A protein has these predicted regions:
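Single conserved hydrophobic/aromatic residue that forms the stacking wall/gate
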Residues: 1-8
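Metal-dependent amide/peptide-bond hydrolase catalytic core
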Residues: 13-185
Length: 185
């Protein structure tokens, strides 16, 4: 809150983006996205308050918490330099999912043996939040994705969309994979 909240908001936005481009290890992916900016209702009145909302995700827990600290430092610095009152709330969120290399290779081998090499794809690193991260921080595990789409049945929408659907034939495949993993590991 201050007399020039829009300017402070802009300063925060630019400065926060420097964290993932300047402060991180370039070999450890992370993303900071400001996804909502709310403040003001007209063109000729400076809003008394502007609210920024976003998300920060990282592939390394040490960096994740160091970045949280850095975000606080950046925001505090802007508050001091502008005289603004800035209330920062960081929801820690889900921990990073860690795929244990041994368990992951075993799961991949089981999938290839059970369903065939043409049905197994090695996925790329993703920045999604997943509660499985709580498990993978405690015990060796492997997070894998079960393909549930089917172009022939026009089941093509991604998760978190209003038209999401699954090909129910995938349920049997998932059950077989989980049962084989459970019996093997």
């Amino acid at each position: 809150q201050c007399d020039w909240s829009s300017d402070v908001c802009s300063s925060d936005l630019v400065a926060l983006q420097q964290i993932t481009s300047r402060d991180r290890n370039p070999l450890s992916p992370s993303v900071l996205s400001i996804c909502a900016i709310n403040g003001g209702f007209t063109t000729n009145v400076i809003p008394s308050e502007v609210k920024l909302m976003g998300t920060f995700r990282a592939m390394d827990e040490t960096w994740r918490f160091a970045a949280h600290k850095r975000i606080q430092e950046v925001v505090d610095g802007i508050a001091r330099s502008t005289g603004a009152e800035i209330d920062l709330k960081i929801d820690v969120g889900y921990p990073t999912v860690y795929n244990d290399p041994i368990v992951t290779e075993k799961a991949r081998s089981i999938a290839v043996e059970t369903f065939g090499i043409d049905k197994v794809e090695d996925g790329e690193i993703r920045m999604g939040a997943e509660d499985f991260g709580y498990y993978s921080q405690k015990i060796a595990g492997c997070f894998f994705r079960l393909g549930t789409g089917n172009k022939q049945k026009n089941i093509i929408s991604g998760v978190h969309t209003p038209t999401f659907d699954i090909d129910e034939d995938a349920i049997e495949i998932g059950m077989r994979m989980m049962a084989t993993l459970g019996a093997t590991l």
